[in-house]
Amino acid sequence: MMKPETSAMEQTSSEILEKAIAFGNNGINLIGRMFIPVNASKHNRVPAAVLCHGYGSDQAIFEDSARELAAEGIATLTFDFRGHGSSEGELDGSIVDDVMDAWDYLHDQPEVDHKRMGLIGHSMGAFSAILAAGKLRKAKVLVALACPGEINNPIAVNPRHIFHPALKWGITMIFKIVQRTHKLEVRVNWKKFIAFWPKMKPSRALADLDNCSKLFVFCLGDPAAPYNKFLYSYGMASEPKRVMVYTGNHDTPLEEGMLRSQWQKWTVGALHGRHPY
């Protein structure tokens, strides 16, 4: 177990304190950042949320949202997944552990109200956040932005086929083409990463999250995470739940505009105990 590290707290606005952090319980040092409302303390605990970026991205993609949520009284934590940004290691089959490590770090902060914590993720980060929520069974709020659907193809999910050379090569090439096309900098253990996806079932996790308010956000022009591919998982999700489908592309939920404003407003209401539906 690594000893968590933090930098000195700095006040970046009249409303928010920020600090760089490092944490990790699984032999991988993860780099992140916390955004804390200035009025938060152990005597005035506030809601909190972990924000999880997508494949090939890093924590910077969520910093605007993290600051805006902190300005609304919610402590936030962003971080780089293993194999991404400044964090150590390679992207493999343990990304859910990264989310849970981030959750534990945030949970341990004296300013945080443990009963009002949430997970927010985009793309791969949304997929991982759902799986982590299923393991933790403690999240009050779950926000999944542009989440890929699970793999239900009987050939792909059969353990005998996962490492079939042709299947493994095909899936690997798809990720590599995306990585090169968009100039993504990711350190990947392909064997472990490719084996991870078919075995993970967000629908099972979502079915058991009865006490968690869930929001799913999709864009009609998103070929990476088409909303119709997530319908099975959404159908399996327990209430309370809501879906937003807007025009846009894979990254539109992260960009300044109406959609980002809407899901952030929903999150603020849910974590502050105001009915968001």
How would you describe each model-predicted region?
Residues 54-67, 81, 228:
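The serine-hydrolase catalytic nucleophile loop
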Residues 2-44:
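N-terminal cap/lid segment of alpha/beta-hydrolase-fold proteins
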Residues 183-272:
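Serine-hydrolase catalytic core
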Residues 82-114:
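Catalytic nucleophile-loop/oxyanion-hole region of alpha/beta-hydrolase
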Residues 44-54:
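Short beta-strand element of the alpha/beta-hydrolase
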Residues 66-86:
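Conserved alpha/beta-hydrolase
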Residues 111-123:
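Alpha/beta-hydrolase fold nucleophile elbow
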Residues 134-191, 213:
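Hydrolase active-site cap/lid region
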